[in-house]
Amino acid sequence: MHLIIYTAALIAALLQVATWDFVQRAGEPPDFGGQIASLSLAYEPTHVPFHGKDPSVEAVDHDLSLIAEIAKKVRIYSVEGTTAEVPKLAQKYNLSVTLGLWLDDERDAAGNLIQEAHDRNRQEFEKALIIARENWNVRELMVGNEIMLRARMEYPDIVDPETGATQLSPEARIRLDDLLGYLREARRSITKPVSTSEGWSEWAAIPELGAEVDFITTHNLPFWEQIRADNAMAYAFEKYDVLRRIYPGKRILIGEFGWPSQGYNRMAAVPNPLKQAQVVREFLIEAERRGVDYNIVEAFDQPWKTFEGSNAGPYWGIYNSDRQPKFKLVGPVQKDRPWMPVGGVLIGSFITVWSLSRRRPTFGHAISYAIAANAIGAGVMSAAVYPFDYYLNVGLWVMWVIGFILMLPLSIITLAKVHEISEVLLGHQPIRLLSPDKLAPALPDPAPLVSIHVPAYKEQPDMYKATLDSMAALDYPRFEVLAIVNNTTEEHYWKPIEEHCKQLGDRFKFVFLPKVEGFKAGALNMALKDMDPEAAVIAVVDADYQVHKDWLKDLVPWFEDSEVAIIQAPQDHRDGHETLLKTIMNAEYAGFFDIGMVQRNEDNAIIAHGTMLMVRRSAFDLAGGWATDTIVEDTELGLRLMAEGWHAHYTRTRYGWGVLPDTFLAFKTQRHRWAYGAMQIIRKHWRKMLPSSTMLTPQQKYHFVTGWSYWFSDAVGCAISFMNLVWVPLIILAELAFPAVSLTVPVLTAVL
């Protein structure tokens, strides 16, 4: 048996290792043996709310030393704070500088000047001019960054309905005029080339802007255009060629090109470390071949962009935020994390061996469970590594912690389900399951008297009478039927039942309880006084169930085993074909009774259901009868009897058929009652599940705890749905983002 378990664990572990090897396989993009023409360097803006930590001069100097190892030039976007020291510090490393100055929108939508923004822009502008004049290594000046791109996104172009021609909106026009004013002033003030940086589409749409710069600086970023990584380089140069045709003879600088290593997909554009290395290397080689001037964005990852609601934005660096290279420019590219598959295999193997060592698994059962356990192990490792791959803001930390915690019970529930299904479908044939071909003990003479209790609350009389008629046809010598109508004062409900019992004979007793407390259990307890004192077995059937004539004849003999207190037959339904909803509900019920109950029965841990249930009278009396402090008195009684050492048996053979809820609302109400009842049982009997308790076997505890966890998961699912709704405004207003992919492996395992 252990050989089967270890073999399955080994095979599943090898499959996991192979999967990790495929996912983390080394890529071999083309080598780039030269130096990068230019790299962007940007720090957290100090004047923006929630930002503001300026790097030290020593930190900037260290960054420039790293850039100098692989690049000839550095591009900066502002002269704010310590960034203003970059040109001077870069001279030590013989780095040229593309000097940028940042311009905020200084007018509102109506064109009114925002004085604070204007003053800040003027200060930035004049400071940049001074730096450009005083530093020999400043090669060019960038006045503003993507000003018109932002303006056109905020205020879309106006389309002429007749000609289809487009023109700038009045609001965007105001921003263009302000930008042109700064450009003209800069060109008059310094002798070095002046430009501004925009997306290629802005240069194509606004030739007026191109006329006011010494050279074109275009941002060609295929990722944001939703272009596949394989086509990124070709797309960038295609747009470059478009601008060459529009501006013949004018120098064109690809001011930004790059690819993120992490983040959400943008349709076909997929960020990951291997694709980043591939895209950047291919571009560098082609740019060198063509003699194109370019700048790669970024030198370093920018974690502060997570506070701006950007998912891929922080991950464009050649170096990560710890200043470690994410890939080299030559040689294979691989994420070297051998501890991830090792951790996943250890988790998967431990779960497999620990869980199956108490069973008698077949190879099919063992391998299916081992594969699921290894999938969970891989998922746990993927989720655990998330903080190492992503820069987490407060919202990401909150959601990652919550997601990781919730992933653990999901994993447990998933493994329990896989164990249940694979053991029943692929495991050994059940030993304890009662079946027609299993020889039952001989029925003694006289046969035990069975008292069948049929409680009803405002049930339709015709349906109730059909149930009683089916019992009248039972092929069993000694039984009685108690037709219990409780809390139903309307005569049209109970009077027909009373009359029908008289017609069916002395075996049928009508018990009318107009006012009862204590839920269904209260009615059943009050009806006990009407039960025949000689009754040896109590059977309970819902008022909508029509029973098979052999029900008692086939199952009562098993009570000859003096240790047996419960015999349970499955619930089934005679109207499952009527609607699609009922077909789905019936299939869901059947899955539990044909799989879950069969497996639980092997460990003497079935759930007692309040229909098609038979209980030994003496055990019932010793247990104290039906408990009135829960709405699921049947399940609670079953748990008490098992805790007292009694045995329960189950048969998969159908002996009764009821009716399904007619509407989804009725189905939901039923499930709410079951879930609420389960919580009542947990509150009452949780101490029996503690390791120190000896009232239940470990296997019984396992089944009850995992069974209850399904109800917990449903409740948590509702809570998470509510949390998702609450989280939406936090994402929008507070920019608290949500980690996604790393937590989905256990979810996918659960679905599959």
Regions found by a protein language model. Give the residues of each.
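Long helical/loop segments within the catalytic core of UDP-sugar-dependent glycosyltransferases
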Residues: 499-536, 549-631, 636, 642-643, ...
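N-terminal membrane-anchoring/stem segments of glycan-assembly enzymes
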Residues: 349-444, 703-727, 731-738
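Substrate-binding cleft of extracellular glycoside hydrolase catalytic domains
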Residues: 85-192
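Aromatic-rich peripheral "rim/lid" segments of glycoside hydrolase catalytic domains that contact
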Residues: 32, 46, 52, 265-276, ...
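A conserved acidic beta->alpha catalytic loop
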Residues: 477, 485-497, 514-517
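Cell-envelope/extracellular polymer assembly enzymes that use nucleotide-activated donors
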Residues: 448-451, 480, 485, 636
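Aromatic- and acid-rich polysaccharide-binding/catalytic face
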Residues: 93, 99, 139, 145, ...
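Short, acidic, metal-binding catalytic loop of nucleotide-sugar glycosyltransferases
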Residues: 468-478
